[in-house]
Swiss-Prot record:
Taxonomic source organism: Xenopus tropicalis (Western clawed frog)
Residues reported in the UniProt entry to bind Zn(2+): 349, 351, 354, 380
Keywords of the record: Cytoplasm, Membrane, Metal-binding, Mitochondrion, Mitochondrion outer membrane, tRNA processing, Zinc
GO biological process terms on file: tRNA-guanine transglycosylation
Domain of life: Eukaryota
PANTHER family, alphabetized: QUEUINE TRNA-RIBOSYLTRANSFERASE ACCESSORY SUBUNIT 2 (PTHR46064:SF1)
Organism lineage string: Eukaryota, Metazoa, Chordata, Craniata, Vertebrata
UniProt gene name: qtrt2
Protein name: Queuine tRNA-ribosyltransferase accessory subunit 2
Function summary: Non-catalytic subunit of the queuine tRNA-ribosyltransferase (TGT) that catalyzes the base-exchange of a guanine (G) residue with queuine (Q) at position 34 (anticodon wobble position) in tRNAs with GU(N) anticodons (tRNA-Asp, -Asn, -His and -Tyr), resulting in the hypermodified nucleoside queuosine (7-(((4,5-cis-dihydroxy-2-cyclopenten-1-yl)amino)methyl)-7-deazaguanosine).
Major subcellular site: cytoplasm
Amino acid sequence: MKLSISKVANGARLGVISNIGRNGDKTLEVPGCLLYTKTGSPPHLTHDTLQTIEGVPAVTHITLSTLAEHQEVLEEYKEGIGKFAGMPDAVLYCSTHDPVSPCPTGYNTNKAVSLWGAGGRIEMTAQKFISAQRVLRPDWFQCLSDGEVTPGGNSRKRVKKSVDRTLAFLDECLQLLSGHEDLKPCVLIGAVEGGDLLEERLRSARETAKRPVGGFLLDGFHGGSAEKELSLISAVTAALPEDKPRFIHGMGRPDEVLECVQRGVDLFDSCFPYRVTERGCALIFSHCYRPDPETAVLEKSETSGAERNGDVGAESEEPDADRAEMTSFEICLKEKRFREDFRPLLEGCSCYCCRNHSRAYVHHLLAAKELLAGILLMIHNFQHYFRFFGSIRAALRDGEINALAELIRKQSS
């Protein structure tokens, strides 16, 4: 795996990761995102349906927490999760946890990290972890780490222990890896821990960079774009080598993505469009930093604040918890005001859903609890999100990243 940076603007890095995959014949542009999956499959979608989506990332994101309990089956299969899940040619990145599912805290020890799957808790020692990676056969995988500590709410002693444990797990995994020829083509991604303590974040970053890892995961950030988190991200990326990619999980809102991109982060998960789909919502934010004057007025009226968030008191079947999580970048199609709205989800969108169906139809599917609702929303939300990353790269090439950041900022609540 080789990262080539072609341009740096306001901290944002434009480049290409080449020589990826078992055959080293694929590339991934950065800034970019990964294709989020549940147990190896894109949520709501078949692989045939996935082919209808434009701009699908070259790297697929799988999660050890959802696959560890199926290890015996995969051991019998003997050909890895890629072929088992119908993706024999996919480049796979395996993270330890599913960014969508919060993990209970207080279960990690010096010897093992706790994973949480459908069947409950699974204790993962370094030996078991490497054994699982040999069965899954990913191209990249996040090293085992004590990621329970997040910014805020942890003692200094607990934060320091998190960093110490993570470095110990990294050293043990590297030692175990050296004894397995079948894992030599795999790239190990080191995790940077440290909660909200700058000195511990920097210690974790510098010590991890001394080890032979292929990239870095900025772990323990879960969105909100708080100034404290953003300043920590800036400090960590400044301490990392420039020739290796930086990953982050849990920062998926468009405004969060741009804040992180401008602080040197390269790769993101694509959990955000999945969360939006699960709320019965559709992404409608604009990422066109050079709008067509003929359509600018239409787009402005289409994506007004009321349009995105819904009118106050709008009738909806949306649970209160879901409404609280809604962002200004989406509309809730469960609201009854869409019953007779025969426009596409987003004017100008070329996805299958917008070309063939209306807001009213998706509203009906949601009201009737039809499975097709999730399929159509996932198609639209994935494609819109993937195109957003294309706009980020184009804005960097054109020297317009500040214009794009301002456009997104104006749409954020």
